[in-house]
């Protein structure tokens, strides 16, 4: 009989679920790294410089002449990566699909507080109506182009793979 009571007690003890402590996890506040800026919040010289450098890249498609960036205009990685050969290949595709480049229209400006980069979103205007392209010019805190990216235009801003800016100042 003692064995049956002991076995029954053991089964009851194992069968009882222990009550989990009521732990509430605090919601970690989401860190906002991108802030949309108005055109008046950005220095006029920086806007002009971003526009001119972005336009210089796309005008290469019309003129076939590219003036390379210097150290005061762009970071070392941008200078090394933008070559006349690479631009020629890209321009050949763009001219065939979209026609001649006309101009850039500034649509939005964002500040990435994590990398201290100002991102200028331009809509690239071409002669063919089917063209719906975006040119992003990333300017670091030394007013240098740290990246340039061309993609299809989207009304919503997305990070689009660019993470690490080159911050050399040589």
Please place each PLM-identified region on the residue numbering.
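Short secondary-structure boundary micro-motifs
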Residues: 42-44, 62, 92-94, 106-109, ...
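Hydrophobic alpha-helical targeting segments used for export or membrane insertion
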Residues: 6-11
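Short, low-complexity N-terminal intrinsically disordered segments enriched in polar/charged residues
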Residues: 19-63
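Short solvent-exposed beta->alpha transition segments
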Residues: 67-116
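Positively charged n-region of N-terminal signal peptides that target proteins for export
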Residues: 1-4
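Exposed beta-sheet edge and beta->alpha loop/turn motif
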Residues: 111-170
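C-terminal motif of bacterial Sec signal peptides marking the signal peptidase cleavage site
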Residues: 14-15
């Amino acid at each position: 009989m003692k064995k049956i009571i002991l076995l029954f007690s053991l089964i009851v003890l194992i069968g009882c679920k222990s009550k989990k402590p009521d732990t509430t996890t605090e919601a970690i506040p989401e860190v906002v790294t991108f802030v949309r800026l108005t055109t008046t919040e950005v220095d006029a010289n920086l806007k002009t410089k971003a526009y001119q450098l972005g336009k210089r890249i796309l005008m290469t498609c019309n003129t076939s002449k590219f003036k390379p960036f210097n150290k005061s205009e762009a970071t070392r990685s941008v200078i090394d990566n933008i070559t006349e050969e690479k631009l020629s290949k890209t321009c050949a595709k763009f001219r065939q699909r979209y026609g001649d480049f006309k101009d850039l229209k500034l649509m939005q400006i964002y500040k990435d507080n994590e990398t201290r980069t100002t991102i200028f979103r331009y809509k690239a205007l071409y002669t063919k109506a089917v063209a719906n392209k975006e040119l992003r010019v990333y300017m670091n805190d030394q007013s240098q182009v740290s990246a340039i990216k061309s993609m299809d235009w989207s009304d919503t801003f997305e990070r689009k793979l660019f993470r690490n800016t080159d911050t050399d100042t040589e």
